[in-house]
Amino acid sequence: MHNKKFLLIGPTESVLTKRGNRFPDFANFLHKNGAQIEYYTTDFYHAEKRRFTIKEIFEAKTICPYKLIVWHVLGYSGNISIRRLISNFLFSSILFIRLISRVKKADSIIIPSRPVELIFFVSLIKLIKGSKIYLDIQDIWPDALQINHKFRKKVFTYYCNIFLRNSLKRYTYTFHTAPSFVNWLRRYSKNTPSVFLPLGWDTSRWEDKLTGVVPQTEMNQNEFNLVVVAQLQHQIDIMPVLDFLRTNSNYSLTIIGEDGNGERYGDVTAFIKHNEIRNVKFVGVVAREKMSDHLRDKDIGLLPMITTSIPNKIFDYLGAKLPIVVLGKNDSSDFVDKFDIGWSCNYNSESFESLMKSISWGNLVKKKANVEKVRMHFCRDNLHEEFFKIVTAKCNNLHKS
């Protein structure tokens, strides 16, 4: 294992970023197990649409136990824009040019499922050099991007298909973070093996940090403290929840992670102000290590997301030992229902209100017990072991989906 080299490519995710640490965790785990790591990322912070400072980059390289390579890239201001596509293409093509002469057949490359240009150019490295390549499916283009303009959506879909159609079949193995993502994979490749490897929760953030939790009592049942961990981007629609809170002041909602720049932030605050809702609290962006402090006195974690996936916030709730309510029918609702760790309802205020008023203290205790039973299956320590077995296996036919 000491001679094994892994190249991890994370254009928007690294030790520099505050959101998303799956790839840095992969890199740390492989490094601790004796692998040689090269981690490629960029100087552009996608979440905040800004460049990292020289100081931030220097400090990141200083604390990194492996080799961190930070490239300058073209910045952009919109998630859906020509400039972003150009930036993605330039990064991916330059990566190919620089790596093709350096990568050896014995090396392994691990990349995320976006941008699609990266999927294509890394598949060319496999075609030419024979290296093993692994894809971590956390997001799916073009499906995941919400484009209302029909012509633009058609053009973007065509653009994505150009890069995906003949690329995914070359991948040695893939990991999908939500079951429905396999449908996307099979659209382009019938035989590429894949295994369910969810995002999971970090034991260092949660274990031994939940002491002093304020317990609910029979005295205040049906007066639950609700929480949403999310920035109010397009895919997060909390309006059904706010409509419920408008007429149910005995419930409270805390929103963690909104910095005032979310796409829905203006509409949400306007609705709260217009209806004089006083039982909603904004906390703002919270450091990962401080999240447990903000969830320790909450009763139920909410996921009001219009797109399908099983995001990090689900595992924040699991880490905090909270039952979960999912609005809508999607991968997250299937996950919660399968393990009986919460509830799901239709995506409207009437269904949400009916559900909330049906939840008693006894129901909550039962769901909490189920959370306790299953949560360790989804801690990252265990998931990393599964990941390690696959990327170090001599024959990658362990778990076909």
Regions found by a protein language model. Name each.
Residues 1-66, 243-246, 392, 399:
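N-terminal subdomain of nucleotide-sugar transferases
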Residues 7, 175, 217-236, 242-246, ...:
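Conserved donor-binding/catalytic core segment of Leloir-type glycosyltransferases
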Residues 25-26, 93, 97-100, 104, ...:
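Membrane-proximal helix-turn-helix segments that form the acceptor-binding/catalytic region
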Residues 46, 229, 252-268, 284:
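Glycosyltransferase donor-sugar binding loop
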Residues 172, 277, 293-309, 322:
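Acidic donor-binding loop of glycosyltransferase active sites
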Residues 180, 200:
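Carbohydrate-associated surface elements
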Residues 264-265, 277-287, 294:
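Active-site donor-binding acidic/aromatic loop of nucleotide-activated sugar
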Residues 349-354, 361-393:
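A charged, aromatic-enriched C-terminal amphipathic alpha-helix characteristic of glycosyltransferases
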